[in-house]
Amino acid sequence: MSNQKKRNFQIEAFKQRVVVDPKYADKTWKILEHAIHEIYNHNASGLSFEELYRNAYNMVLHKYGDKLYTGLVTTMTFHLKEICKSIEEAQGGAFLELLNRKWNDHNKALQMIRDILMYMDRTYVSTTKKTHVHELGLHLWRDNVVYSSKIQTRLLNTLLDLVHKERTGEVIDRVLMRNVIKMFMDLGESVYQDDFEKPFLEASAEFYKVESMEFIESCDCGEYLKKAEKPLVEEVERVVNYLDAKSEAKITSVVEREMIANHVQRLVHMENSGLVNMLLNDKYEDMGRMYSLFRRVANGLVTVRDVMTLHLREMGKQLVTDPEKSKDPVEFVQRLLDERDKYDRIINMAFNNDKTFQNALNSSFEYFVNLNTRSPEFISLFVDDKLRKGLKGVGEEDVDLILDKVMMLFRYLQEKDVFEKYYKQHLAKRLLSGKTVSDDAERNLIVKLKTECGYQFTSKLEGMFTDMKTSHDTLLGFYNSHPELSEGPTLVVQVLTTGSWPTQPTIQCNLPAEVSVLCEKFRSYYLGTHTGRRLSWQTNMGTADIKAVFGKGQKHELNVSTFQMCVLMLFNNSDRLSYKEIEQATEIPTPDLKRCLQSMACVKGKNVLRKEPMSKEIAEEDWFVVNDRFASKFYKVKIGTVVAQKETEPEKQETRQRVEEDRKPQIEAAIVRIMKSRRVLDHNNIIAEVTKQLQTRFLANPTEIKKRIESLIERDFLERDNTDRKLYRYLA
């Protein structure tokens, strides 16, 4: 094996310098320069692009790239200055057309030149970090043509003038506009923005500022909104046709500011045509347009919502505090429902079912519904009217819709316990008189109340229905155990559980003998089948059906109250009775007796008795006889039927007092629950917590809460802190 060292072979560089003929570069450039002239002069068809490419290639290869690049700039600049002169000389409409044609020519020339100088573009330009040929061509066009002192301002003014003409209804060459504005975009984003878009937006702002002032002085609100809507569509169309897509948001913002935002207050409050006028006259289309336009600008919808709320509250306040409109409870509630329906339609059809508008509607209704302290009573009376007669022949879905509307008003009530009080009274009268049109509707409403307020709210109402069912079963048992009673008067007894039904003072009266005997038999039966029970007859709540024969044998069935029955039965044994005699025989209290006689002797069509002397009032000196001339086209005649009417002022005060008494234990229970959980709490937090817990039933009065706290302290449920008297402690 050889131990010789390995040798490294080296190849030395060629030492003899290759010398290129100095005239070569000049000759080659002349060829290329001539070709560029020919291209700009539209004589490129006779050129050999392969040969030209090879010449440019060799110049770069032999280090004459700089000469080639500099020559290109000089030659292109020469031609562009010539082009500029020709464009400057163009008159009128020919100006833009020539500019566009020369721009297209320049682009075609630039493409050919770039193809010829492709090798220079890839090597020399990249190495020396110079501007590439295509971009160079754009810059030279910009600097020598677009920025020419005689073209720049003229070009901008021409374009803006064409836009103005189009805005005022003239037809313009949109294709030409698109091509020229596309030129700005091709020259670079900054060129488009600084040299066209910015002045375009400024001119647009001025145009719409002037136009909006003209419109607002000559149009009503609805007409103005139509005119404001139109340019928003037109400007988007303008962008699509000949502007940069990025300009859409900017020009839209200009129109929104000048046509809408700057006039929001004036438009909304415009006399005889602003938002209030639209609300009053159900102008859904105008309101919908206002909503869609105002949502585009800051605080636009807030303004619309605030004006609607203010109007709604003023209208509602007038509605519920007008004494004339409070005379009929059913009409009072129906007006509330009509207004609610109206604004539901407005919000749905015009305001895009906007939740913030819905919330404003709800808060407004809650505000004015509670301004009238009788709203809970009136809503209950409305239900009473519907469930007595108003829902006859109404489909199940429509019934449910009406009940849902009632529940909507119920939710607005701050004193739901007051509603409960009245509802219980009215339900009791319906059940006892058998005057409800639908048991299903009655139960359906109770289910809705239960869902809304919980079991505690409806437990007594459900107890009333239970009593009605139990009473029916009890009566069947009573008559089954006394078959001998099938002949004679029929007794129908409702056994009411104390606590479930509204408490009423027990008013005793002397029942007719045949009825009294039946009552005693029922008492014996009931107490014999139930242990630990006590029965107390509520004759003032009863009704009776009695058959009567008048002069000439005319027969009728009279539906009367128990008191009226007691009076009428006396005339089976007497032809003529004085007020005093009736009073002694029946022992009906004076106010009730007078009302009873008045309904039978002084009401046309119900006057089964005749009073002597004739007058509208009942006096203790009056005498009464059966009215032999009584006639009615109906066999069954209702006399003095019990209908729910709004309470008198004293009755209202009495109900209010009962409600206040019922609230006391509820407030105390809430305080105890809170303190048991928190152990120690200050006065203000107790007030806040109690109010929050009870708000589903009523709005607790802070003064009453304070009284209940004092009462609980006295009974050792709570104590004050020794160091901080505003703190309370729970005593286990």
From Swiss-Prot:
Hydrolase in keyword set: no
PTM section of the record: Neddylated. Deneddylated via its interaction with the COP9 signalosome (CSN) complex.
Pfam family, one: Cullin_Nedd8
Keyword terms: Isopeptide bond, Ubl conjugation, Ubl conjugation pathway
Domain Cullin neddylation as annotated: residue spans: 662-724
GO molecular function, one term: ubiquitin protein ligase binding
Disruption phenotype: No visible phenotype. Cul3a and cul3b double mutant is embryonic lethal.
Pathway: Protein modification; protein ubiquitination
Disulfide pairings: none
Origin: domain of life: Eukaryota
Transcription regulation as UniProt keyword: no
Record's protein name: Cullin-3B
Provenance organism: Arabidopsis thaliana (Mouse-ear cress)
